[in-house]
Amino acid sequence: MLTWETPVMLASNTASTKKLAFITTFLIIVLCPVTMVMSQPQADVLPLPASDADCLLRFKDTLVNASFISSWDPSISPCKRNSENWFGVLCVTGNVWGLQLEGMGLTGKLDLEPLAAIKNLRTLSFMNNKFNGSMPSVKNFGALKSLYLSNNRFTGEIPADAFDGMHHLKKLLLANNAFRGSIPSSLAYLPMLLELRLNGNQFHGEIPYFKQKDLKLASFENNDLEGPIPESLSNMDPVSFSGNKNLCGPPLSPCSSDSGSSPDLPSSPTEKNKNQSFFIIAIVLIVIGIILMIISLVVCILHTRRRKSLSAYPSAGQDRTEKYNYDQSTDKDKAADSVTSYTSRRGAVPDQNKLLFLQDDIQRFDLQDLLRASAEVLGSGSFGSSYKTGINSGQMLVVKRYKHMNNVGRDEFHEHMRRLGRLKHPNLLPIVAYYYRREEKLLIAEFMPNRSLASHLHANHSVDQPGLDWPTRLKIIQGVAKGLGYLFNELTTLTIPHGHLKSSNVVLDESFEPLLTDYALRPVMNSEQSHNLMISYKSPEYSLKGHLTKKTDVWCLGVLILELLTGRFPENYLSQGYDANMSLVTWVSNMVKEKKTGDVFDKEMTGKKNCKAEMLNLLKIGLSCCEEDEERRMEMRDAVEKIERLKEGEFDNDFASTTHNVFASRLIDDDDFGFAMNR
């Protein structure tokens, strides 16, 4: 057999050599013209790419008052893995991923060109500064995903083609500047745009036709816009179009007959250039297709020949296959054993063993550590289930499993988690790490020994386990107010910075210091589930008017105050929407009107003799925060200030005078505050 096989193989090799020579000649003939076209001289010498640090330092030189960022030291790298050495620089895997210089009083014109060479740059934020002049050029930032320029002093018209080529841009915030002229038509051609805020400017004319199907939020209020609202935006919140010259059509009132129809889809400013490029692109694609077909043919020939040569050795091939199958099954058995305890409680196992950490001061662990650890079910809330678990280091953690975030994209979710990871406040429970999978998300935080405020307010109490006394409750609500005030200052672009404030989302540490949880999750929640489950959507303004405002979180704070003072669970939280008949606010108001104010307070709440007036003050704040008309409702900053001013056993006459008018309608009178305080 060998004497016959050897000549056959040699002949085959000779034939293969001829075929490959023919294919090579053909490829040279086909590719030479393409190579000649693509190799036209672009520049005599290509400059060496600048480092990220060089780009940042050149950008710093363009700033008028850059003393705020003195930490930008040329001798130190801007990034160290996922942590930042330079203030305001955001890093991912050791590369500059973003720049966040917000609220620093920066002035002058904003020149972004020095940053264009940072290849991994994905987000820029210069909100709440004093930059002036025209809109900075962003045409060289094709990979940018988010641009935040709100609350500055930019002026002038934005060119129609200002955003051409920004095919990855998802979020653009230009609110509260002084831009004028028409809305740039190139915005309508950003394929991945999710959020657009143009409110608080001087744009005029008609709104262009936005054809993006995934556009979730578009804000045009307080401009000089007129004409019909494009049909593609008809499902937006009506508030997004308020304060304009003469806009009409859904979701606003219908247009009159002379208002014209919805504006046509605008022509792209670069459509002519694109058409000219289509012909060249088509030729290149055809050539590439031919090349791929040839390569595929060669691969098939070689693969067939290899199979024929291997068929002479069936026993060896069988041994290899059996060994592979054995190893694979063994690995599956090991994986199944390691996650049995987890799957029995949590369901499906995440398919990538990678946790992303947001805090640097915590010992690292991986997903397998969590899978192997025993866990205690803490509860099943509206968003998902919570588990208490401990890792090898002895640290106790809470793992929250969220099921209603599967509509958010991977990049958008990562960006929002990094934003939450930068929040630092004594009354916020920081997210230690998180895990992303499309079907579900895991958020990991430190376990708090005294659990939630709800467990203390609504659990069965005894002599050994009494209810919370008044000083502790005051301490808790003051901490909650401080945490909310911080969220309002840091998350200015969110309509509802918390969005899901309730007693079960306030946890207590070993000294009963409160920490807020589940904050700022609305941007990554599925729309349908957030409407049905989040506390903000049970507010009067959403049920009666169909919108949320900054004061929606104030309403949630007011209900929490009343829950803390009365010890009663807000039953309206169990129903969908707002039901005044089931509202805790209605019950408290009726008790006050009936001169039964003393019966409102939780009888298990002990305190000093002279704390009655202070408790009444907090009750007044709570009711003021719960005004059904949000225009009459207290501002968050005022509520935080008044709560912080409360001191045990003291009465503030100035505060009482400022709130007299608000509560006169509810017949609250200081003299009526008669009840037996437990001692």
Curated annotation (Swiss-Prot):
Q: Tell me which residues bear Phosphothreonine.
A: T472
Positions bound to ATP: L378, G379, S380, G381, S382, F383, G384, S385, S386, K400
Which spans are transmembrane here? 278-298
Q: Does the keyword Aminoacyl-tRNA synthetase feature in the UniProt annotation?
A: no
User: Which ranges are annotated Basic and acidic residues under compositional bias?
Assistant: 319-336
Q: Which domain of life is it from?
A: Eukaryota
> Per the record, which residues fall in region Disordered?
252-271, 311-344
Question: Which coarse location class describes where this protein primarily resides?
Answer: membrane
Where would I find the LRR repeats? 118-141, 142-165, 167-191, 193-217, 234-257
Give its localization: Membrane
| Gene3D superfamilies with a match to the protein in the record | Phosphorylase Kinase, domain 1, Ribonuclease Inhibitor, Transferase(Phosphotransferase) domain 1
Annotated family? Belongs to the protein kinase superfamily. Ser/Thr protein kinase family.
Give the domain section of the comments: The protein kinase domain may be catalytically impaired due to the lack of the conserved Asp active site at position 500, which is replaced by a His residue.
Q: How is this protein named in the record?
A: Pollen receptor-like kinase 4
